[in-house]
Amino acid sequence: MKLNKYIDHTLLKQDAKKKQIDSLLSEAREYGFASVCVNPTWVEHAKKGLEGTDVKVCTVVGFPLGATTSAVKAFETKEAIQNGADEIDMVINVGALKSGNLALVESDIRAVVEASGDKLVKVIIEACLLTDQEKVVVCQLAQKAGADFVKTSTGFSTGGATIADVTLMRETVGSDMGVKAAGGARSYADALAFVEAGATRIGTSAGVAILKGELADGDY
């Protein structure tokens, strides 16, 4: 198994410096990760830094709270793609889901899907804040809205991916969608366990350590 191709090599910290982003890009080129995941302000820089490779540029929308309006999320998506983004990781409107406003949750996802054109859209459900029933419902809504992936976590809330959540999400969406486990993978064994549970992507800042068989310091 080429585990490197499962990894979205991630740096989303608000205080990330250019030299840290450059290091992320250098590692992505060396290890051939699936993508780098960076904040929108770094997309154009990342695109230039990865020219000549097959590493994709992934960015985030409505991040990390998911509480911006659908129009704002759609604008963010369009601008990110204009700047070179290949993949969009959007955050759902968690408050709307908790309030039972499923129509808003679905239309919010659909707004990003439509704005993304042919680019990949991953829907962050922030599983640590949801009941199992809510996880099932929102995965179904993401599927209905035409998204490509469901993703466990932002890495900025109360917890990251768990095997139980990845298993439930995979069972819910079947084989038609990708499942991204974000946070929670701190070792090669962790990453492998997520893949075996049904993950087709792993979001982590510790991709290099994982591939080297080392134990990572952080959770994301």
Curated annotation (Swiss-Prot):
SUPFAM superfamilies: Aldolase. It comes from the Bacteria. It is found in: Cytoplasm. CDD domains: DeoC. GO terms for biological process: 2-deoxyribose 1-phosphate catabolic process; carbohydrate catabolic process; deoxyribonucleotide catabolic process. The active site is at D89 (proton donor/acceptor), K151 (schiff-base intermediate with acetaldehyde), K180 (proton donor/acceptor). Pathway: Carbohydrate degradation; 2-deoxy-D-ribose 1-phosphate degradation; D-glyceraldehyde 3-phosphate and acetaldehyde from 2-deoxy-alpha-D-ribose 1-phosphate: step 2/2. It catalyses: 2-deoxy-D-ribose 5-phosphate = D-glyceraldehyde 3-phosphate + acetaldehyde. One of its GO terms (cellular component) is cytoplasm. It holds the Pfam family DeoC. InterPro entries: Aldolase_TIM (IPR013785), DeoC (IPR011343), DeoC/FbaB/LacD_aldolase (IPR002915), DeoC_typeI (IPR028581). It is an enzyme of class 4 (lyase). Its EC number is 4.1.2.4. Keywords: Cytoplasm, Lyase, Schiff base. Catalyzes a reversible aldol reaction between acetaldehyde and D-glyceraldehyde 3-phosphate to generate 2-deoxy-D-ribose 5-phosphate. Belongs to the DeoC/FbaB aldolase family. DeoC type 1 subfamily. This is Deoxyribose-phosphate aldolase. It comes from Streptococcus pneumoniae (strain CGSP14). The lineage of its organism: Bacteria, Bacillati, Bacillota, Bacilli, Lactobacillales.
